[in-house]
């Protein structure tokens, strides 16, 4: 009697196993259930998938709250897609157990609240996309588990302020996108934990002054985008801490009126600068023309006097003809800076030839 009962139990278990490992209803599965695609299939709760699943695409479904342990039974997941899922809240421990996860896509949701602990266990996460949500703040320690984070997209949210410790723990972060938020200030210390940033985009915010203190600990920024902020002026030593690495700088559409004389101190590798659509009439004497390859200048009221002779010389040496014209003096108004006679009487410095040293 024992043997028939044992056989019956084994039979029931065998029947259960395929169901547990089966492809979720209305989804498409590939690579022996390693890739599970449930894009826009009307899901309202996270489906059960095989433990060997590596890619799970749940885009365009409806998960208002990601509760704790929502994905705990998926230990081998590497890539998780949750875009356009009407998510409002991510609870503490929502991704607990996903210790192999590298890609996490949470873009285009309605996320307002990210609880402390939301990203616990995500020690291998490298790419985090939180753009196009309604996040208003980053709680201190939120990113602490993300010790391997490389790219963080937070553009198109509602963040008003960055406080000290906002990026605590994310020491390997290299690309940070904060474009199109509501930032009016970057507090001193806000970026101290991510001193290895190479790309920092904070354009289309409400920064009314250049955040010198917040940027002072950054060491290797190659690309800095500050477009569409009401900055008006750039102070001395603005880029000095990362001046040996800075290659691309966006300051267009900022109502910028002036650079301090020492604004570009320490900047030696700058190649591309965007200054269009501002209120500039001069450039500082130490503007780094020597390394420059492209310079966007249009729609500025340039004052064509000898103070601008460095720009004239740079333009003469370039095959391209940036559309920059004089606004003053009156007799040169509308003339191209490259062609005008406004600089005829200016003395241009000449490069001295090196003399042989004494032996």
UniProtKB/Swiss-Prot annotation:
Principal cellular location given in the protein's record: secreted
Tissue expression profile of the protein: Present in chondrocytes at all ages.
UniProt record, GO biological process: bone development; negative regulation of bone trabecula formation
Gene3D superfamilies reported in the protein's UniProt record: Ribonuclease Inhibitor
Signal peptide: 1-22
GO cellular component, one term: extracellular matrix
Record-linked InterPro entries: Cys-rich_flank_reg_C, Leu-rich_rpt, Leu-rich_rpt_typical-subtyp, LRR_dom_sf, LRR_TM_domain-containing, LRRNT
UniProt keywords, alphabetically: Disulfide bond, Extracellular matrix, Glycoprotein, Leucine-rich repeat, Repeat, Secreted, Signal
Disulfide bridge positions per record: 23-38, 304-346, 306-326
The UniProt record lists the keyword Phosphoprotein: no
Coiled-coil region(s): none
LRR repeat placement: 76-97, 100-121, 124-145, 148-169, 172-193, 196-217, 220-241, 245-266, 269-290
Limits of the LRRCT domain: 300-348
Quaternary organization: Mostly monomeric. Interacts with collagen type II.
Main function: Promotes attachment of chondrocytes, fibroblasts, and osteoblasts. This binding is mediated (at least for chondrocytes and fibroblasts) by the integrin alpha(2)beta(1). May play an important role in the regulation of chondrocyte growth and proliferation.
Descriptive protein name: Chondroadherin
Organism: Homo sapiens (Human)
Gene: CHAD
């Amino acid at each position: 009697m024992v043997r028939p009962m044992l056989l019956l139990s084994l039979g029931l278990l065998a029947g259960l196993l395929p169901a547990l490992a089966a492809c979720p209803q209305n989804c498409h599965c590939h690579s022996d259930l390693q890739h599970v695609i449930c894009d826009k299939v009307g899901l309202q709760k996270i489906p059960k998938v095989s433990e060997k699943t590596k890619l799970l695409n749940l885009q365009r479904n409806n998960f208002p709250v990601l509760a704790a342990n929502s994905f705990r039974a998926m230990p081998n997941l590497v890539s998780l897609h949750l875009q356009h899922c009407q998510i409002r809240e991510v609870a503490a421990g929502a991704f607990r157990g996903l210790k192999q996860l590298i890609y996490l896509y949470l873009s285009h949701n309605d996320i307002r609240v990210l609880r402390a602990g939301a990203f616990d266990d995500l020690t291998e996460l490298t790419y985090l996309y939180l753009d196009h949500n309604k996040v208003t703040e980053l709680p201190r320690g939120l990113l602490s588990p993300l010790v391997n984070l490389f790219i963080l997209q937070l553009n198109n949210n509602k963040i008003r302020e960055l406080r000290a410790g906002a990026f605590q723990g994310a020491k390997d972060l290299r690309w940070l996108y904060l474009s199109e938020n509501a930032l009016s200030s970057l507090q001193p210390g806000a970026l101290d934990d991510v001193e290895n940033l190479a790309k920092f985009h904070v354009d289309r915010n409400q920064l009314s002054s250049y955040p010198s203190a917040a940027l002072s600990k950054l060491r290797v920024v190659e690309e800095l985008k500050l477009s569409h902020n009401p900055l008006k002026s750039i102070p001395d030593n603005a880029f000095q801490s990362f001046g040996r690495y800075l290659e691309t700088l966006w300051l267009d559409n900022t109502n910028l009126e002036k650079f301090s004389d020492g604004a570009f101190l320490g900047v030696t590798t700058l190649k591309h600068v965007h200054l269009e659509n501002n209120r500039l009439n001069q450039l500082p004497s130490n503007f780094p023309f020597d390394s420059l390859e492209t310079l966007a200048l249009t729609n500025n009221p340039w004052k064509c006097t000898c103070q601008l002779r460095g720009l004239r010389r740079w333009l003469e040496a370039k095959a391209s003809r940036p559309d920059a014209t004089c606004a003053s003096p009156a007799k040169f108004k509308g003339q191209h800076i490259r062609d005008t006679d406004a600089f005829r009487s200016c003395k241009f410095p000449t490069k001295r030839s090196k003399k042989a040293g004494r032996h």
